[in-house]
From Swiss-Prot:
HEAT repeats, residue ranges: 128-163
Protein name, entry field: Protein maestro
CC terms in the record's Gene Ontology section: nucleolus; nucleus
Pfam families recorded: HEAT_MROH2B_C (PF23227)
Gene3D superfamilies for this protein: Leucine-rich Repeat Variant
Signal peptide span: none
Record keywords: Nucleus
Lineage: Eukaryota, Metazoa, Chordata, Craniata, Vertebrata
Organism: Mus musculus
Gene: Mro
Keyword Repeat: no
Length: 248
């Protein structure tokens, strides 16, 4: 039976001007819907932040932990512009969680979320929060939990990048008081922590204080100075060892 016939190949019909006119109102409608959704998202973010702020102050540690996780999700998913807009509120809640008197889970979640926050705001506008975060991050470098130590080293490395001129003197003191921890964890039993520590040491090299040298340097002292500069670029962990043991 020859009922099936081959249909010759024909070019697809091009859209007429009439179909284009129909499409224009559709695009306009979609853009309006998109704009309304963006407004709703902004309002949703504000409302979500209000709820999380209440949960972060709850007497129940589990609820506080969930609040920190929620802040982490907001910091990760919200547009950078919105995160910067509400950074003071978020930082206040996260620092509160960072110093939680009871729950190590709340503290760890706060550290993880702070690493996201600092990445989003690039360290701008931290204000006095910088001191609070640095002091607690230092204590967590020696935590028993591998995951907490890892997150603390990542956070401390970020702080080294964002210290700037305002906090340079303060952070230099903190780094030099942390030399033993930095040196010890280069050989951490957790490879992940050891790697994070190495990256943090590299970020902290500009804040390491060598011993003071007199204005007149002997040939040996000049060689030591050159060696310090070379090690700071190539092997900062060795330089840290030399400084900690007063070899250089």
């Amino acid at each position: 039976m020859e009922q099936t016939r081959k249909i010759p190949n024909q070019p697809l019909p091009t859209p007429t001007s009439q179909s284009k006119k129909r499409r224009t109102p559709l695009l306009s409608f979609l853009s309006k819907v998109s704009w309304k959704l963006r407004l709703q998202k902004r309002e949703l973010l504000k409302n979500a932040l209000f709820v999380l702020a209440e949960r972060a102050r709850d007497p129940n540690a589990k609820k506080r932990h969930l609040a920190m996780r929620g802040l982490g999700a907001l910091a990760r998913e919200a547009p950078d512009k919105q995160v910067r807009k509400y950074k003071k509120v978020m930082l206040d809640l996260l620092v509160r969680g960072l110093y939680d008197p009871v729950s190590s889970e709340v503290i760890h979640e706060s550290v993880k979320t702070l690493t996201i926050m600092l990445g989003k705001i690039q360290g701008h506008g931290l204000g006095s929060f910088f001191i609070d975060i640095t002091l607690q991050a230092r204590t967590l470098l020696d935590d028993e939990d591998d995951s907490v130590r890892y997150s603390a080293f990542v956070l401390f490395g970020q702080l080294a990048s964002f210290a700037g001129w305002r906090w340079k003197k303060f952070f230099t003191q903190q780094v030099n008081q942390t030399q033993d921890s930095l040196l010890g964890h280069l050989q951490d039993e957790s490879p992940k922590v050891a790697k994070a520590c190495k990256m943090t040491v590299r970020a902290c090299v500009p804040y390491l204080k060598p011993r003071k040298v007199p204005s007149f340097q002997s040939e040996e002292e000049q060689k030591n100075h050159r060696l310090s500069r070379q090690l700071s670029h190539c092997h900062p962990e060795i330089l840290l060892f030399f400084y900690a043991n007063k070899i250089l």
